[in-house]
Each structure stands twice: as C-alpha cells, then as structure tokens.
Amino acid sequence: MANVSKRIKALRAKVDRNKVYPVTEALALVKETATAKFDESVDAVINLGIDARKSDQLVRGALVLPHGTGKTKRVAVFAQGAAAEAAKAAGADIVGFEDLAEQVKGGMLDFDVAIATPDAMRIVGALGQVLGPRGLMPNPKVGTVTPDVATAVKNAKAGQVQYRTDKGGIVHCTIGRASFEVDALKENLAALVDALNKAKPASSKGVYLKKVSVSSTMGAGVRVDQSNLA
C-alpha cells in the first residue's frame, strides 16, 4: 500500500499547480495521473466572471459533447399517448405518466436523466422534493421539458451534459473518461467552452472565462491555457 501511495504522490508531483498548461499537455497529464483501477471521469472546472448573486447572470444550459461522456445514461420520460410511443422508439429506458410518478414517489430512481412533456409537468411538479435534490428535475432551460421527447432522449443517450454555475460562479462538468484519447477530450472541452461563451449573460462585465482547469476523479487539478481552446 505504501508503494502505491508513493507512486500516486510521484505522479501528482508532476503537476505544477502554479503553471498554466497548453490544453493538449494538460489533458495528457490528467490521463497520466489517473491512477484508479476504474475508468475515471475527466472533469472541467471553469470559473466565470459573473455575479452569481444576480439571477440574470445565472449561466445554465446543456450540450451534446462531440465524443459523449463515456457513460450510458438511463433515461426516464414522463409522457402519454403519441409522445410516450415516440420516447420508447427513441430508446427511453422508462416511460410512464401518473404510474411513473407513483413509482418515483415510492423511491424508484433508477435513471440518470428525467424528461417530461409540458403537459406532464403538472404531475412532475409534485415530485420536486424527490427529483430536485438529485438534479433530476426536468427543466425547459436544458431541454428536458419539451414536446419533442424523442430528440431529448436521443441527445441524452448521445452524451448530453448539463451545466450550471454554482454560488461561486463556477461550472463543474464531465468531459469524458481517462480512457478517451487526448484529442477527444480536447474537442469535448472546446465544445463546452464554446457553449459557455454563447451563454454569456449580457450584464456580465470584465473577463468572462477567468480560469479553466481539468482533473480526473482522483487526480490533481491542472490549469489550462484557454487561449488555445478555440
């Protein structure tokens, strides 16, 4: 065990916390220092120049990463009639209406993404205390409340990620797995940065992308030079 600890410390020592790395080098370091026995997630942490106390500066949205996340998501859809059939055809894992709501109330939460048609929100709204704390509440801002549930299901299955600034104006988002090639991680990160740039609040002043760093689940954070992300 001591030898493992020494090996991990040696790998993490390769990361200079005060250095800003070119994106390709940063991601290569993340891959190299991902030492867990499982395929670690690679996450981006992006500090935005916003005032998180102001509701008009909340940055929130969703995008389909070019290379996905490396995780197959289970999708639940609250819909009925033709929309329910479309959701099933698109690959939804669980589809229902009042019956699904009752299952969720009873503790059934065997899904990673919840999608709802607008008319289903009268039912889903009552599940806020169950779905909300788990980040599963459908929301039109991220495309999970929509009449086009088939597209929403396909996006979720294709590797869609949701992003939202926290109280400190920071976005945390998975951009892949340690097993991904560097180029795939780079393209996923660039897509996330592009989406954040497009979502910049009009009232945000000064430097918007203040700091970008990447890390694996168990690894050290690596600062990224965002000038070569475009």
From Swiss-Prot:
GO cellular component: cytosolic large ribosomal subunit
NCBIfam families: rplA_bact
Subunit structure: Part of the 50S ribosomal subunit.
Species: Methylobacillus flagellatus (strain ATCC 51484 / DSM 6875 / VKM B-1610 / KT)
Key words of the record: Repressor, Ribonucleoprotein, Ribosomal protein, RNA-binding, rRNA-binding, Translation regulation, tRNA-binding
InterPro entries (UniProt xref): Ribosom_uL1_bac-type, Ribosomal_uL1, Ribosomal_uL1-like, Ribosomal_uL1/biogenesis, Ribosomal_uL1_3-a/b-sand, Ribosomal_uL1_CS
GO biological process annotation, one example: translation
Annotated family: Belongs to the universal ribosomal protein uL1 family.
HAMAP family tied to this protein: Ribosomal_uL1_B (MF_01318_B)
Function: Binds directly to 23S rRNA. The L1 stalk is quite mobile in the ribosome, and is involved in E site tRNA release. Protein L1 is also a translational repressor protein, it controls the translation of the L11 operon by binding to its mRNA.
The protein's name in its UniProt record: Large ribosomal subunit protein uL1
MF terms (GO), sorted A to Z: rRNA binding; structural constituent of ribosome; tRNA binding
